[in-house]
Amino acid sequence: MTERPPFSYDEMVTRNAGFVTPAEQRTLRDGRVFVCGIGGMGGAALQSLVRAGVGNFSLADMDVFETSNMNRQLFATLDTVGRPKVAATCAAIARVNPHAVLTTHGPDWVEKLDDILPAHRVVINGMDDLAAGIALYRKARQHGATVIDAYTSPLPSVTVVRPGDPRPEERLGYPTLGIDWRAITPALSNACKAAEALYVIVHSSSASHIDHALAAGLIAGTHTRPSFAPMVIETGTLMAFEAVKLLLGRDSGVDHRGVFLNPWTMEVERPRAAPVAWVRERIARRLLARMMA
């Protein structure tokens, strides 16, 4: 049996040369990223960052891998189905970069954000849990952390919410302001989903790329979120790029409102100007009303 050569971080990142300088590579190696939700988008972002050479991660996810995850979650395989996502993902990362420093958090991680966030200025939100996401955003503002996220949309998207930016619940008009995240009911959660869906319809071509009946079920909480590998993995890749920019102090063309990447037309869709958005919102409200009827 051939002996495996010893791992070399420098050799692993050799092909990064030209994209980042040696000094920037050292910055990535010393960088820290908190990823909550390491399934689809979060898992894709995480794998890209590991292979880019980021050296320190804190990971949180309460779920186990299921067969239905295998259509888009990079760490879901026949070997990991039935295993806790955090443990299985850590094992996979160790097979890529055994020098990566991994800190894991249990089901109570939301309660420990005051301890987690001071050490992380870059956070990737890969969760579907809306209430936990609201708690994350509130605490990120307090601790000066930037949250990279994406919309619930059939198109790849990415948002970068810096500490001074409005939270999604403020910007999108969620009915959760002033409510403890633990007290967010399913009805409130569905109202938040509807508010997000309205923004997505107004500011992107998403409505042209999804089955409306299925989307209505998602908003109503009667259907699980549809996920397609190219969309999910592309979204995770966009998130990883934004994390790299933040770690390296590079400028980004993405703000708290985000952008959509339409792979069907190869266009970048940005927030629409106010007069156009005003007209489209009225159309979108009628569309949502028909969808929910």
Name each model feature, range by range:
Residues 49:
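Aromatic pocket-lining residues of Rossmann-like dinucleotide-binding sites
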Residues 54, 59-97:
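Glycine-rich phosphate-binding loop and adjoining beta1-alpha1-beta2 segment
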Residues 1-19, 245-293:
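Phosphate-binding loop/pocket of nucleotide- and phosphate-handling active sites
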Residues 41-42:
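Hydrophobic/small residue at the entry helix of a nucleotide-binding pocket
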Residues 119-230, 263-293:
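E1/E1-like adenylate-forming module used to activate ubiquitin-like modifiers
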Residues 30-38:
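Beta1/beta-strand and adjacent pyrophosphate-binding region of the FAD-binding site
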Residues 224-247:
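Mid-domain beta-loop-alpha active-site segment that forms a flexible
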Residues 86-122, 127-134:
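A structured beta-alpha segment of the ubiquitous adenosine-cofactor-binding alpha/beta core
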